[in-house]
């Protein structure tokens, strides 16, 4: 009986440690859609690895163009072949997984010419992918959770207008989540203005293909310094560490799983805005098993 206070104190310490760890627990976001060999959306969410799935990409829109979605080898949107994705979207959402549509990407034809052009794109997105109505919804009748900005080319203006117009649709019922994947050099050349609106829920920063602010040869200082600048300057609900899921997924910036879990994550998880890790992409994650190796540490 004399040892009971010590045991109680130990249990209390363990409970406090568990609470602290749970407060900083994050989720994994994954990009899906650019390789037909990465499995369906339903299969992706059935793995239990991911909290967010970003469908990539709507890579033609704006400046008067007819918008087009490109899901690589998954389906052919020109023949309405991608409406079957609705089943996958709903299956994911039924598991509590948020599903977004990503705008842009590294290859495509997209830009915004004016505030009115941004409004037209927002209206199109609302009617064709969100809570609006259209006879030509490319992914069928499922209602996505939000829109992801992965703007890497084209115009540098009016993305803030697009964010504001999309945010306004949250007033019509279901919240429209806004997410973004800026490059780690601060500020982002294309999305800086949009991110300054403070309207974004999740920001998954690309810490790869950018040597000045990525992990390199055992040096994590540039990455951590960049992370701290982003999280202390931009207003967003949560920030995510964006990484390639394998060394083949990007030209540079891959972090071995053991280095990520032992060195990088402990250095950034103290941030109150820490949300988890974003990976490019589902196909490369399948090949490497990266998410399985890091999941318990994220």
PLM features: residue spans?
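Long amphipathic alpha-helical assembly cores
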Residues: 274-281
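Bacterial N-terminal signal peptides
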Residues: 11-18
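Chitinase-like catalytic core of GlcNAc-active glycosidases
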Residues: 2-7, 21-263, 268-272, 284-297
């Amino acid at each position: 009986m004399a040892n009971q206070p010590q045991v109680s104190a130990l249990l209390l310490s363990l409970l406090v440690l568990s609470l602290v760890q749970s407060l900083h627990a994050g989720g994994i976001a994954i990009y899906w859609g650019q390789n037909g060999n990465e499995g369906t959306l339903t299969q992706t969410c059935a793995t239990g690895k991911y909290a967010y799935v970003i469908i990539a990409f709507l890579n033609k829109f704006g400046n008067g163009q007819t918008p087009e979605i490109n899901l690589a080898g998954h389906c052919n949107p020109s023949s309405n072949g991608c409406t079957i994705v609705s089943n996958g979207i709903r299956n994911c959402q039924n598991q509590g997984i948020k599903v977004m549509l990503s705008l842009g990407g590294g290859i495509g034809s997209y830009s915004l010419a004016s505030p009115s052009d941004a409004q037209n794109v927002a209206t199109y997105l609302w009617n064709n992918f969100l809570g609006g109505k259209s006879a030509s919804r490319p992914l069928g009748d499922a209602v996505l959770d939000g829109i992801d900005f992965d703007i890497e080319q084209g115009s540098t203006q009016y993305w803030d207008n697009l964010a504001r117009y999309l945010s306004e649709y949250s007033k019509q019922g279901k919240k429209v989540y806004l997410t973004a994947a800026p490059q780690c050099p601060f500020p982002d050349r294309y999305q800086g203005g949009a991110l300054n609106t403070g309207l974004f829920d999740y920001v998954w920063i690309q810490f790869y293909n950018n040597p000045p602010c990525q992990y390199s040869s055992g040096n994590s200082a540039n990455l951590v310094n960049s992370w701290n600048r982003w999280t202390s300057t931009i207003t967003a609900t949560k920030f995510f560490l964006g990484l390639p899921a394998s060394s083949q997924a990007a030209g540079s910036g891959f972090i071995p799983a053991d280095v990520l879990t032992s060195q990088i994550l402990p250095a950034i998880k103290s941030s109150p805005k820490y949300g988890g890790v974003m990976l490019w992409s589902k196909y490369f994650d399948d090949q490497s098993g990266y998410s399985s190796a890091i999941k318990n540490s994220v």
